[in-house]
Amino acid sequence: MKKTALMLSAIALTISSSIQAHEVTLENVARDFADQPTKETDWYMSRLQKEIPVNTFKHNRIPSNKDHQFVIRENEDTMYSHAILDVTKSATILMPKYDEYAIVQVIDENHYTIAEVYPGQTLNLTPDMLSSGTHVFLNTRVAASNSQDLKALKKANEYQDSIKISSVTSNPYVSKGFSEKQVLAARAKVQKLRPKIPMPFDMFGNKGAVDLTSFVIASSAGWAGLPSDAAVYLPQIPGNTGSTECSSLTINPPPLQYKRHAFFSMTVYDKDGWIADDDFAISNKRMNPNQDGTYTFRFNCKGQPNNLDVQKGWSGLLRMYLPDSKQAIQNYVLNDYLKNAHLVKGPNIK
């Protein structure tokens, strides 16, 4: 009888431990899912390697939309070009000058952003710059002056073609063999913590420059985000409950390097982080400010300016490209946005 009781206690303890192991929290996510950034990166690199040869760009000629998206939580702000670059010995990225926003983000196999390249710059890559591995993922963003103007899109497409990459070696990227089912299952668990990210300024960056908990969550919730010197992402709209009723958000313009074609935008997603509607994004380039200089985004307010369509359980992501400085954008977020911006019912016409 005593032996049976001990066995039952052991079984109960095992079941309890199993349940706890599957409960993802801010306290355990960095420990239990430490390799998730590497798995996510391998998932994207393996998919791309099947589509194009190494050291070759795959250009997306139109902005992302509900029928055309490769990475979770993409946006309409820029057109993406993706490549896997072999850095076994050395490689080079060359970006000609351009009079709109553009950037090549260099991501190593562990999802660390090891470099950023802007128009007019050339970068020489060597293997010692990587945290590990021999290949990098190039996440290139090229903006048009107006994402809905065909002439502007053509100009941006021509610039995409002018970006040059080269490498001494051409070894294909070899998948690490992670189970896609396990990667996606872990992603579903980890990204539930997205609204609770503790350090939104340190979600992305190079090794040693990120907050590990924020980094692990963001790797699943918004893979290939830029470091805060290049962009800041606010993954939660204050007051948003995922309701589909007409609502609005008014903000002060953030401190950005507008002379370098900096801009800010709002993009909305479904409950899983994917683009689900036609009118899902807008940037300040296509908005008229209110009389007091503020900007108002509207959600499911048909017929109103700056309106975005949303579905039940939606989330919104405010992107701010090229902050004046890390200190300036932190001050804006903490002392302006989080204190003054709040989702309200109705179109809030000013």
PLM feature segments, named:
Residues 21-350:
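A compositional/structural signature for long, glycine/proline-rich flexible linkers
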Residues 1-20:
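Gram-negative bacterial Sec-dependent N-terminal signal peptides
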